[in-house]
Amino acid sequence: MNVIDLFSGCGGFSKGFLDENFRILGAIENFKPVVKTYLYNIKAPVWMDDIKRIPPKAFDEFIKNEKVDVIIGSPPCEPFTKANKLIKDNPLDRLYKDKVGRLVLYYIDYVNYFTQRNDDLIFVMENVPQIKEIKDELKKLFGDIGHKVYFNILRAEDYGNPSKRARMFISNIKLKPKKVDKLVVVEEALKDIPKDAKNHEIKKLSKEKVEMISKLKWGEALYRYRGKKKLMFNWYKLHPKKLAPTVKGRSRFIHPYEDRLLTVREQARLMSYPDDFVFFGGRDVQYNQIGESVPPILGRAIAKEIKKQL
């Protein structure tokens, strides 16, 4: 079963499908360090460019015109998330007037093109739950190309992810993966990391910063910032017996037992990445790749559901 991944990021979504023995034909991603991460771990070809400059027909040729069974992908969520204090007030403006929001339309163009080549195509588009504010418009756009769509909100922690993460998965099938019996908490996620693991370098902090974070209790944060409608937190001290909060691109977490930030590897553990999944780019770029991805364990749960349909 063949998959293409649009707006692939570092490859968390693709990794989940690989783990269920799907074949990744190719991906589109436009940021070089992220592409390097994807190529190293997923080992599938990537067209590195802005999707606006890649017509579906050209990408079809790039993957040698092979049959596409599944399209996955995660158009940028910034235009739709309330964490963005510059989010446009009119929901439709987020789709049509925000140049980043318009990337969703390119995803739909790809679905349209590959549907014409395979009537049984399945697609899954990931975004933040707030994208439901343009639900009717998305129903119309997908309906115009022959697809009834379902708006599936899935919580990654229900499938074994150690951090909370509610996301919308818009698809032409209902997605109801089997949930795990027991949640995975921070302490369990962070244990037994080999000292020589990749991406496991500890960031040196100033004495003043160490003193500040030493005074924090579990569940407290050093910094706060204003989202569109609510206060957001960063440098959050993790509670060892609970789930971690949602991992975002700029999220930084404090170790529950040590006065330091989590390493990139530890943060990747919170998003269910295996230790042999290596991240490239500067440290901030690595953190960002993790926070902007679909946890592989959730991607795999979705892949299992799709297998039933195919």
Swiss-Prot record:
Documented EC number(s): 2.1.1.37
Purpose: A putative methylase that may protect DNA from cleavage by an unknown endonuclease.
Record-given protein name: Putative type II methyltransferase M.MJ0563P
Catalytic activity: a 2'-deoxycytidine in DNA + S-adenosyl-L-methionine = a 5-methyl-2'-deoxycytidine in DNA + S-adenosyl-L-homocysteine + H(+)
Active site: 77
Transmembrane segments: none
One record GO biological process: negative regulation of gene expression via chromosomal CpG island methylation
Every SAM-dependent MTase C5-type domain range: 1-310
Matching Pfam families: DNA_methylase
Similarity remark: Belongs to the class I-like SAM-binding methyltransferase superfamily. C5-methyltransferase family.
